[in-house]
Swiss-Prot record:
Organism from which the protein derives: Aspergillus clavatus (strain ATCC 1007 / CBS 513.65 / DSM 816 / NCTC 3887 / NRRL 1 / QM 1276 / 107)
Pfam family, one: MitMem_reg
Keywords: Cytoplasm, Initiation factor, Protein biosynthesis
Protein name in the entry: Eukaryotic translation initiation factor 3 subunit F
SMART domains attached to this UniProt entry: JAB_MPN
Transferase found in the keyword field: no
Localization (cell): Cytoplasm
Protein's job: Component of the eukaryotic translation initiation factor 3 (eIF-3) complex, which is involved in protein synthesis of a specialized repertoire of mRNAs and, together with other initiation factors, stimulates binding of mRNA and methionyl-tRNAi to the 40S ribosome. The eIF-3 complex specifically targets and initiates translation of a subset of mRNAs involved in cell proliferation.
Residue ranges, annotated region (Disordered): 308-345
GO terms of molecular function: metallopeptidase activity; translation initiation factor activity; translation initiation factor binding
UniProt GO BP: formation of cytoplasmic translation initiation complex
Amino acid sequence: MADTDSFLHLARPLGPVAVGSAPTTAPLNVVIQPQAIFSILDHSLRRNADQERVIGTLLGTRSEDGTEVEIRSTFAVGHTETTDQVEVDMEYQKQMLALHLKANPKEVLVGWYATSSELNTFSALIQNFYSGQGDGTWPHPAVHLTVSTEAGKDIETRAYISAPVGVTAERAADSAAFIPVPYEIRYGEAEKSGLEAISSARDAENRATNIFTDIEALERAIEDVLGMIDRVSRYVESVIDEEAPASTALGQFLLNTLALAPKVEPADIERDFNNHIQDVLVVSYLANTIRTQMELSNRLATAQLTLGGESGGAESGAQRGQRGGKGGRGGQQRNQERGAEEARA
């Protein structure tokens, strides 16, 4: 899901420029992973009742040219906010950041988030800290992500970077001009399946859902596609009957989508599908045969070891008996010779 707003990127300074340093002024695009959004929502649900918003740190990756930032994970940072001042536990933030970077060396600090769409002086203070030199993202801009979590309303997400404003250096420390940047919540097939499974539990009273098997997931996907096709067909019929206004953009999109469909006869598709099913069955049969053969081989090897141990024990006992018999006969012969010598004497 991408933001549909339009943006104008202008070259801008990102903070007090030090001698010999050059800030990044390239356009920026933000990519957000779903797990980062879930982490922010979980933090918002666990906040104190008297807190209007909570804040935290954004971690992720940045492209080599710095024009794209991918937000992958977050962690909460404690803060206290009143009408007059704001206090942020920066020591905790630094320690947690060091631990996260040690566990995930490929990730870097990219910015911070807040569960409120409001931008105020305190937002500028926190933004200047995250975008500063040393412990901040300098020379890259810090991304400020706002996620509105107001009950009963849809979740709204916005992404910003900042440019310094202020007449004096003292005023520039708590001032910043927030510039909206385009963002995209990007997810793959695995994340999409997980999101669909989670969303299916929202209408249940116990807030629980069952995990679908691969066949059930495929069936649901096919049903969704058939529903989309029916909805598009009804729209096209209503446009043809002049019951709905025509849209050139939508018509072009449908034309491009139909152009992606392969030009294959239904009989060929059925034949290829049946061949694929046969191949799958053959592979499954061979796998079961190999597994049975391995189990049989293991059992035969175990039986041979058991029989070999029993026969070896019997043979060793017989050999000990023979040695004992020989020892007995030798002793008897020596006694007879000793008796004969005594008789001659």
